[in-house]
């Protein structure tokens, strides 16, 4: 499920912004899920749980004037390593339901997702919605 920064307990500290790589992203044909293949560093201990979130970040005081004309919906893929040691590289998959942004999808080409990568800092990935047949 997509979470909104600042809503309820969804604070910057809880959601985190630790480094993570996205190696592949895709949206299901029915546009209901975004799946992300990812890499991260950790100890891979059962005692250390990492948290992953897909975030709507409304921290900007005023949206840019051209936001209404933007062809992509902006989201952030966030990682909280909960203080785990960056011991070895691991990988996995996670899927997020897109129902919270379903109304915003009309007329858009896809999603623009911000990721704080392991090696290259902040990157933005554009993932297009599948074409309807």
Per-segment meaning from a language model:
Residues 119-133:
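Short beta-strand elements
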Residues 31-33, 70-72, 89-91, 108, ...:
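A general secondary-structure signal for short beta-strands and their flanking turns/coil
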Residues 1-39:
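Surface-exposed beta-loop interaction hotspot
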Residues 23-80:
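Short helix-loop boundary/capping segments
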Residues 78-112, 116-118:
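Short, solvent-exposed, Trp/other aromatic-anchored flexible loops in extracytoplasmic proteins
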Residues 46-48, 107-109, 121:
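Short loop/turn segments at connectors of secondary-structure elements within structured domains
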Residues 4, 72-76, 95, 112-114, ...:
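Ser/Thr- (and often Asn-) enriched beta-sheet segments in non-cytosolic proteins
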